[in-house]
C-alpha cells in the first residue's frame, strides 16, 4: 500500500535542511585556457589531428570527466541553466527583430493581405533582390516561424511591447547564466537532493506545469482574450465600443494595465467584472463568457477561440496542481515511487517476472542516461503529437492560412520528435553499458525482457519484412498496372478500393460524439466534420478525406517506423552482449570492431545502431512530411487540383506530380526574391553529397593518401607539427551522418519554402 505511514525515522531525514554544499569547486580560470582540461591526455594538447575529434566527442560526456556521479549530476544541472540562457537570448533576438526590423504593426492591421517579415537585407553587393514586397510598403524577407501569429494571441499590439520583452529576455538570460555558475561553484546541490525524486515530481507537477499553466491562464484571461476580442471585432468590421469610444484601430486598444481595470474589461467580458464572489459561491457560470467550451475554429481568424484556450489552461493548471500533491515527502502521506514499483507485478501469463519491477526505481534514480532516455522518448512522441495538433487545431490567429508556416511547424516538430526518439535509443544504450548492473536485476521485468530479446527482435524483424514487402508491393503493383494501361486493375478509390475504414471511423466518432458527452461542446474541429472555414479567401480548415492513397502511404509509414524501432531496440537489448560478442559491455558504448583477428564484428556497437537508426528516421520522416505537404496542398488548401488520391498511388506519381512538379518554384527561383532558396537547394545537395565521401570510403584509404601528402610536405620541409591522422571509423561515420542529415533537411527546407512562397 503506497499511502502507508512512513517508516520509523523517515520524517527525521535532514536532507532539506542542508540541500547544498557551499563552495565545492572554486572558479579556476586557468582551466578555461586549457582545452580538454578534464583529461590528462587531452590537456597535453594535440600531437595528431585526432585530438580535436576526441575533444568534440568527450567535451559533454561528463561520465568520463570524473568517476563521481554527484559531480557529473551537478554539471548536468548547471548546464541546464546555460541552456535556458541560450533559449532566452534566442527569444530576445526574435523579440528584438520584431521590434526593430519587422512589419508587425502592418501585419496586425491587415493580416490577410500583408505577409510577415522581420529582416531586411542590406544592399551591399546587390542582394537587395531578396527583399520581397510583403505589402503595406514593406520590403523584406518573408518569415514562416509563426511568431507574428503567436504574438497576436498573446495580446501584443505594438513594437514597444516587443522591445520590452527583448530587454526582459536578456535580463533573464543573465540571471540564468549567473544561476548556472552559482549552483556549480558557490552552492552546489548534494546527491541526496538530486535523488529526492518525490519532491522533484511534486515541484515539477505543481510548480512548473500547474502554476505555470495557471499563470498563463491568468495572462490569457486578463490580457490575451480581451485584446483578441477587440482585434477580432476590428478585423470583422464591427468594432466594439468602450466608454463610448469605438475601438476602430489598433491604436485605440487600451493598454494591458488598463485591461486589468474591471470597469473597462467588463465591457468586453462582463464576467471579468463580476468579482470573486461568484467563484467562492460556486456560481461559476458567471465566468462562461471568458471561459468557454465552444469547440471548432473562430471564423474570423481561422484559429481556436482564445476563450477556449484560456479555459484549457485553467483546467490543466487545476489537474497538475492536484497531481503535485501526489507523492510522499515531509508529511508521511501520499505515494512512494519505490513502493509502487517494488510492489508492481506483471500479468502472470504474459509477463511472469517473479520479481516484477523491483530494482527499476534504483536504476532510474541512479542512472542519468536511463532518465534521459525515458524523457527523450516521451518528449519526442509529444513533439510528434504537437505537429499534428498544430494544423488540425491551429492555436494562433491567422496561422492556418499562412500555409508555409503550417508546413514549417509540422516539419519542425516532426524532425525534433524523430531526433529525440533516436536520442532515447542512444541514451538507453549508454545506460545499459555504463549503469546497468546484472546482479541487481535478477528475474525482474528488465532482466526478463533481456532474456527474451531474441524472440522480440526476430518477431519485430518479421513484422518489418511483412510491412515492407506488402506496402511496397502495393506500389509496385500499381506502377506495373498503370504502365501496362490497366487502371481498372489498380488499387485506387476508382478501382480496387483499400479504404482506411478504422481511420474513417475515428474521424466520424469525433463529429457524431458532439452533444453526447458529459462536457457538451458547441462544435467540433472542422478537420473532422467536413465544414470549410475560409479567411481572406483562403481555406483555413476543411474536412480531410482519407482514401486508398492514404492507406498505402500509411503502411509505408508503419514499415519505416518499425524498422527504426527495430534498429534502436536491437542496439539497446544487445548493448552489453550478444552471441557474436559476449563481452560487448567491456568494449563500451562505441567501438569500431571487436579487435584484430575477428572479422565480421564491425558496426555492432550500440553507437552504430544509433548511427544506422538516424538514416531510417530521416527517410521515415521525409515520407511523412512529403505526405503531409502534398495532402494539404491537394485536399485542404486547393493548390494542386485534388490530384493526391490518383497520383499518390504510384511511385511514378510521387516522383512526377510531387517532387518534380512542385520543385518548379525552387528550380526557377533565380532572379526573384526567393532566389536564396534556389542557392540553398543546390548548396544543401552539395553538403548531402559530401557526406557520401565519409560514408562510402574506409579509414585506410584516407590514411594511405595522407602518408603520400605528408611525404610531399616533408620533401618541401613544410611538414606540420601536428601529425595528420585519418578519421577513425566511428568519427568518419559521425561526420558522414551529420552532413547527410543537415544536407537533407536543408534541401527539404528550400524545396518547401520556395514552393509555397513562390506560388504566393
Curated annotation (Swiss-Prot):
Keyword annotations of the record: 4Fe-4S, Chlorophyll, Chromophore, Electron transport, Iron, Iron-sulfur, Magnesium, Membrane, Metal-binding, Oxidoreductase, Photosynthesis, Photosystem I, Thylakoid, Transmembrane, Transmembrane helix, Transport
One Pfam family per UniProt: PsaA_PsaB
Biased composition (Basic and acidic residues): 8-22
Stored Gene3D superfamilies: Photosystem I PsaA/PsaB
Binding-site positions, phylloquinone: 702
Residues where divinyl chlorophyll a binds: 693, 701
E.C. number: 1.97.1.12
GO biological process: photosynthesis
Highest taxon of the lineage: Bacteria
Localization of this protein: Cellular thylakoid membrane
Disordered: annotated span: 1-22
Residues binding [4Fe-4S] cluster, per UniProt: 593, 602
PROSITE patterns, sorted: PHOTOSYSTEM_I_PSAAB (PS00419)
Cofactor note: PSI electron transfer chain: 5 divinyl chlorophyll a, 1 divinyl chlorophyll a', 2 phylloquinones and 3 4Fe-4S clusters. PSI core antenna: 90 divinyl chlorophyll a, 22 carotenoids, 3 phospholipids and 1 galactolipid. P700 is a divinyl chlorophyll a/divinyl chlorophyll a' dimer, A0 is one or more divinyl chlorophyll a, A1 is one or both phylloquinones and FX is a shared 4Fe-4S iron-sulfur center.
TM stretches of this protein: 76-99, 162-185, 201-225, 309-327, 368-391, 407-433, 455-477, 551-569, 609-630, 674-696, 734-754
Catalyses which reaction(s): reduced [plastocyanin] + hnu + oxidized [2Fe-2S]-[ferredoxin] = oxidized [plastocyanin] + reduced [2Fe-2S]-[ferredoxin]
Stored InterPro entries: PSI_PsaA, PSI_PsaA/B, PSI_PsaA/B_CS, PSI_PsaA/B_sf
Phosphoprotein among keywords: no
UniProt subunit comment: The PsaA/B heterodimer binds the P700 divinyl chlorophyll special pair and subsequent electron acceptors. PSI consists of a core antenna complex that captures photons, and an electron transfer chain that converts photonic excitation into a charge separation. The cyanobacterial PSI reaction center is composed of one copy each of PsaA,B,C,D,E,F,I,J,K,L,M and X, and forms trimeric complexes.
Known function: PsaA and PsaB bind P700, the primary electron donor of photosystem I (PSI), as well as the electron acceptors A0, A1 and FX. PSI is a plastocyanin/cytochrome c6-ferredoxin oxidoreductase, converting photonic excitation into a charge separation, which transfers an electron from the donor P700 chlorophyll pair to the spectroscopically characterized acceptors A0, A1, FX, FA and FB in turn. Oxidized P700 is reduced on the lumenal side of the thylakoid membrane by plastocyanin or cytochrome c6.
Family: Belongs to the PsaA/PsaB family.
Name used for this protein in its record: Photosystem I P700 chlorophyll a apoprotein A1
Species annotation: Prochlorococcus marinus (strain MIT 9515)
Organismal lineage: Bacteria, Bacillati, Cyanobacteriota, Cyanophyceae, Synechococcales
Name of the gene encoding the protein in the UniProt record: psaA
Amino acid at each position: 500500500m503506497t499511502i502507508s505511514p512512513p517508516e520509523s525515522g523517515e520524517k527525521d531525514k535532514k536532507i532539506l535542511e542542508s540541500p547544498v554544499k557551499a563552495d565545492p569547486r572554486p572558479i579556476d580560470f586557468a582551466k578555461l585556457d586549457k582545452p580538454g582540461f578534464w583529461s590528462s591526455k587531452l590537456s597535453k594538447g594535440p600531437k595528431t589531428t585526432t585530438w580535436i575529434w576526441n575533444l568534440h566527442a568527450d567535451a559533454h560526456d561528463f561520465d568520463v570527466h570524473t568517476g563521481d556521479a554527484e559531480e557529473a549530476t551537478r554539471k548536468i544541472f548547471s548546464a541546464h541553466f546555460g541552456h535556458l540562457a541560450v533559449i532566452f537570448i534566442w527569444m530576445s533576438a526574435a523579440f528584438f527583430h520584431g521590434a526593430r526590423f519587422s512589419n508587425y504593426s502592418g501585419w496586425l492591421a491587415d493580416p490577410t493581405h500583408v505577409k510577415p517579415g522581420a529582416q531586411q537585407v542590406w544592399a551591399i553587393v546587390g542582394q537587395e533582390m531578396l527583399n520581397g514586397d510583403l505589402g503595406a510598403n514593406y520590403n523584406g524577407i518573408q518569415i514562416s516561424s509563426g511568431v507574428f501569429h503567436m504574438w497576436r494571441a498573446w495580446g501584443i499590439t505594438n513594437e514597444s511591447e516587443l522591445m520590452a520583452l527583448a530587454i526582459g529576455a536578456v535580463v533573464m538570460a543573465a540571471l540564468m547564466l549567473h544561476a548556472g555558475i552559482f549552483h556549480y561553484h558557490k552552492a552546489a546541490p548534494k546527491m541526496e537532493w538530486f535523488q529526492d525524486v518525490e519532491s522533484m515530481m511534486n515541484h515539477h507537477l505543481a510548480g512548473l506545469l500547474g502554476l505555470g499553466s495557471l499563470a498563463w491562464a491568468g495572462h490569457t484571461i486578463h490580457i490575451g482574450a480581451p485584446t483578441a476580442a477587440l482585434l477580432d471585432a476590428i478585423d470583422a468590421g464591427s468594432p466594439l465600443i468602450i466608454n463610448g469610444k469605438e475601438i476602430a484601430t489598433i491604436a485605440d486598444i487600451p493598454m494591458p494595465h488598463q485591461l486589468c481595470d474591471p470597469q473597462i474589461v467588463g465591457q468586453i467580458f462582463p464576467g471579468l467584472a463580476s468579482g470573486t464572489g461568484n467563484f467562492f459561491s460556486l456560481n461559476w457560470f458567471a465566468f462562461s463568457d471568458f471561459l468557454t467550451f465552444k469547440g471548432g475554429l473562430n471564423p474570423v481568424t481561422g484559429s481556436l477561440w482564445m476563450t477556449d484556450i484560456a479555459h484549457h489552461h485553467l483546467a490543466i493548471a487545476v489537474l497538475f496542481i492536484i497531481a503535485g500533491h501526489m507523492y510522499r515527502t515531509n508529511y508521511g502521506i501520499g505515494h512512494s515511487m519505490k513502493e509502487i514499483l517494488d510492489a508492481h507485478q506483471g500479468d502472470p501469463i504474459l509477463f511472469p517476472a517473479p520479481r516484477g519491477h523491483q530494482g527499476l526505481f534504483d536504476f532510474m534514480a541512479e542512472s542519468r542516461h536511463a532518465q534521459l532516455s525515458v524523457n527523450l522518448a516521451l518528449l519526442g512522441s509529444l513533439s510528434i503529437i504537437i505537429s499534428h495538433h498544430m494544423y488540425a487545431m491551429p492555436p494562433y490567429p491567422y496561422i492556418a492560412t499562412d500555409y508555409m508556416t503550417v508546413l514549417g511547424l509540422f516539419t519542425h516538430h516532426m524532425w525534433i520528435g524523430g531526433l529525440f526518439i533516436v536520442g532515447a535509443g542512444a541514451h538507453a544504450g549508454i545506460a545499459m553499458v555504463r549503469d546497468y548492473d546484472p546482479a541487481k536485476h535478477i528475474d525482474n521485468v528488465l532482466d526478463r525482457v533481456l532474456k527474451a530479446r531474441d524472440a522480440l527482435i526476430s518477431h519485430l524483424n518479421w513484422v518489418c519484412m511483412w510491412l515492407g514487402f506488402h506496402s511496397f508491393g502495393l506500389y509496385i503493383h500499381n506502377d506495373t498496372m498503370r504502365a501496362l494501361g490497366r487502371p481498372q486493375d489498380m488499387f485506387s478509390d476508382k478501382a480496387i478500393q483499400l479504404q482506411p475504414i478504422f481511420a474513417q471511423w475515428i474521424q466520424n466518432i469525433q463529429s457524431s460524439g458532439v452533444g453526447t458527452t458529459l462536457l457538451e461542446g458547441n462544435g467540433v474541429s472542422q478537420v473532422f466534420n467536413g465544414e470549410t472555414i475560409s479567411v481572406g479567401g483562403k481555406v483555413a480548415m476543411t474536412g480531410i478525406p482519407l482514401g486508398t492513397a492514404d492507406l498505402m502511404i500509411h503502411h509505408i509509414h508503419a514499415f519505416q517506423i518499425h524498422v527504426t524501432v527495430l534498429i534502436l531496440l536491437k542496439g539497446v537489448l544487445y548493448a552489453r552482449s550478444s552471441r557474436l560478442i559476449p563481452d560487448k559491455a567491456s568494449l563500451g558504448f562505441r567501438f569500431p570492431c571487436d579487435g584484430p583477428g575477428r572479422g565480421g564484428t564491425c558496426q555492432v556497437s550500440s553507437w552504430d545502431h544509433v548511427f544506422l537508426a538516424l538514416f531510417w528516421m530521416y527517410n521515415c520522416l521525409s515520407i511523412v512530411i512529403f505526405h503531409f505537404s502534398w495532402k494539404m496542398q491537394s485536399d485542404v488548401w486547393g493548390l494542386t487540383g485534388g490530384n493526391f488520391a490518383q497520383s499518390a498511388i504510384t511511385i511514378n506519381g510521387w516522383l512526377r506530380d510531387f517532387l518534380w512538379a512542385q520543385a518548379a518554384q525552387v528550380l526557377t527561383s533565380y532572379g526573384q526574391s526567393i532566389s536564396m532558396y534556389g542557392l540553398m537547394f543546390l548548396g544543401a545537395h552539395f553538403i548531402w553529397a559530401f557526406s557520401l565521401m565519409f560514408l562510402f570510403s574506409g579509414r585506410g584509404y584516407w590514411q594511405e593518401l595522407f602518408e603520400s601528402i605528408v611525404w610531399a610536405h616533408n620533401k618541401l620541409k613544410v611538414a606540420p607539427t601536428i601529425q595528420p591522422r585519418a578519421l577513425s571509423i566511428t568519427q568518419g561515420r559521425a561526420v558522414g551522418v551529420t552532413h547527410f542529415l543537415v544536407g537533407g533537411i536543408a534541401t527539404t527546407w528550400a524545396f518547401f519554402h520556395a514552393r509555397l512562397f513562390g506560388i504566393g
